[in-house]
């Protein structure tokens, strides 16, 4: 995750750490002073773009929680990167699970479906994200998809 000591992702990282998971923080140098103590490993990057690339490189499954423009940017960047990598690596496809709490991402999901149905998608599965309504469904989905990764 982004590796800083604030926000929803800090809470998720803390819970994962407390449950015995290894927590890897990928932190841009500009935010290194905010590195979360819960991280078992810290990877410093030059900037946000390098951070996204590194997170995509090392991730097995991607979870999109309710968030702002940065979350949407990371979601679409991850989707795009996976689609590009699939051209050269058949194993590049990895799950993106979107927690669509209270319809937070209804508009984005609809836009991706519309793009998928348009001639601009050129046969690519733009709408491949798996939408779930809540954390319970997220956990069920992660259990299911993690057996395939």
What are these regions (language model features)?
Residues 1-58, 87-92, 98-148:
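A cross-family phosphate/adenosyl-ligand binding-site feature
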Residues 83-84:
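Interfacial segments of multi-pass membrane proteins
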Residues 7-11, 70-79:
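Short glycine/serine/threonine-rich phosphate/pyrophosphate-binding segments
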Residues 63, 94-95:
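Structural loop-to-beta junction motif characteristic of Rossmann-like glycosyltransferase folds
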Residues 56-76, 87:
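A donor-sugar binding/catalytic signature common to diverse glycosyltransferases
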Residues 77, 96-97:
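Hydrophobic alpha-helical segments of small multi-pass membrane proteins
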């Amino acid at each position: 995750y982004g590796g800083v000591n604030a926000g929803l992702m800090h809470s998720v990282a803390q819970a994962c750490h407390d449950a015995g998971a290894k927590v890897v923080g990928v932190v841009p140098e500009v935010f290194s002073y905010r590195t979360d103590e819960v991280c078992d490993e810290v990877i410093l990057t030059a900037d946000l773009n390098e951070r996204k690339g590194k997170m995509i490189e090392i991730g097995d499954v991607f979870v999109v929680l309710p968030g702002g423009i940065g979350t949407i940017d990371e979601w679409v960047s991850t989707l795009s990167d996976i689609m590009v990598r699939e051209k050269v690596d058949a194993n590049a496809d990895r799950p993106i699970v979107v927690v669509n709490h209270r319809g937070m991402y209804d508009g984005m999901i609809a836009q991706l479906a519309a793009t998928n149905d348009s001639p601009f998608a050129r046969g690519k599965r733009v709408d491949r994200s798996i939408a779930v309504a809540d954390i319970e469904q997220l956990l069920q989905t992660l259990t299911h998809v993690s057996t395939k990764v």
